[in-house]
A protein has these predicted regions:
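Hydrophobic beta-strand scaffold residues
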Residues: 16, 37, 99, 105-107, ...
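NAD(P)+-binding Rossmann beta1-loop-alpha1 motif at the extreme N-terminus of oxidoreductases
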Residues: 1-53, 79, 84-85, 115-118
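Hydrophobic residues within alpha-helices
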Residues: 5-9, 95, 182
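Rossmann-fold NAD(P) dinucleotide-binding segment
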Residues: 41-105
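Rossmann-fold dinucleotide-binding core
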Residues: 86-167
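Interdomain hinge/lid region at the active-site interface
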Residues: 155, 159, 203-269, 278-281
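Active-site-proximal catalytic alpha-helix in oxidoreductases
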Residues: 121-127, 150, 154-186, 197-209, ...
Length: 281
């Protein structure tokens, strides 16, 4: 995700400094897109007015941002840290407090739209930020790779909104998988069914972008099942704090656990279909 997002920034005229734990990947990115690379996250902070982090989970964010060689150690007064990772709201508030102590702005800004959205510069960015002025300053920058961007509230609100997004996706994908399997077993042309029902209330992004590959048993792409389980785990932790009932989402999470047991950890989230068309014995 981070690579195409950075590429869009460079193509829009921003002076980009990249860091990757694999320095060779950073070098290759620079050779292809311009800019420069740093050897540590701290070096990025020392060279940039705005630093954007896009990694895997809470621990990854802490490793990149905090500590002697972390981004925050290099950031100066008046700079801004943006975390595009899908992480916990608790971490977002923790980072916001750490940034405030250094007079650094902070935005938790998880994204939706998948790899295709990143490649096409059409992501949706959900932001949490304690300072409206900081968000307003970053809004034009997000336009480089986003089709929509909204401040949802103070620090943590962006991550909470992403949790809502993932809960919705879990329900929609599971329903779509069962519906398509039902259509196929009933002897219907699944593509034709989708063509018709997508014009009505059943239409969804998942139907538009995943139905054809689902009925053709194609899942070696997209957002991995193991990452979806990570995201849903964050949702469950937050639900314990708020008292929200996620009974149905937990059922879908259990299905993803079965997909992973089948060897589908890296399969797209639409691979729930596999449980129905090729049920494990």
């Amino acid at each position: 995700m981070g690579s195409p997002m950075a590429r869009h920034l460079a193509s829009k005229g921003h002076d980009v400094v990249v860091y990757n734990r694999n320095t060779e990947k950073a070098k290759q990115w620079v050779e292809k897109n311009g800019g420069s690379f740093a050897l540590t996250p701290r070096e990025v902070g020392e060279q940039c007015e705005i630093v954007m982090v896009c990694v895997g989970n809470d621990n990854d964010v802490r490793n990149v941002v905090l500590g002697a060689d972390g981004v925050l150690a290099g950031l100066k007064n008046g700079t801004v840290l943006v975390d595009h990772t899908t992480a916990s709201a608790t971490l977002a508030r923790e980072l916001s407090a750490a940034c405030t102590a250094k007079s650094v702005g902070f935005i938790d800004a998880p994204v939706s739209g998948g790899q295709a959205g990143a490649e096409n510069g059409a992501l949706t960015v959900m932001c949490g930020c304690d300072d409206q002025k900081v968000f307003d300053r970053l809004r034009p920058v997000f336009d480089a790779y986003a089709k929509a961007c909204q401040r949802m509230g103070d620090a943590g609100a962006g991550q909470l909104t992403k949790m809502v997004n993932q809960i919705c996706i879990a329900g929609v994908v599971s329903g779509l998988a069962e519906a398509l399997n039902f259509a196929m077993r009933a002897g219907l042309d699944a593509d034709q069914v989708v063509e018709v029902i997508s014009k009505g209330a059943a239409q969804s992004w998942q139907m538009e972008n995943r139905s054809k590959t689902m009925v053709r048993d194609q899942f070696e792409f997209g957002f991995a099942a193991e990452w979806m389980r990570k995201d849903l785990g964050i949702c469950f932790d937050e639900a314990k704090n708020s008292g929200a009932d996620l009974t149905m989402t937990k059922l879908v999470d259990a299905l993803y656990a079965r997909v992973i047991e089948m060897g589908g950890a890296r399969w797209d989230t639409s691979s729930l279909m596999k449980l129905l068309t090729h049920p494990p014995k």
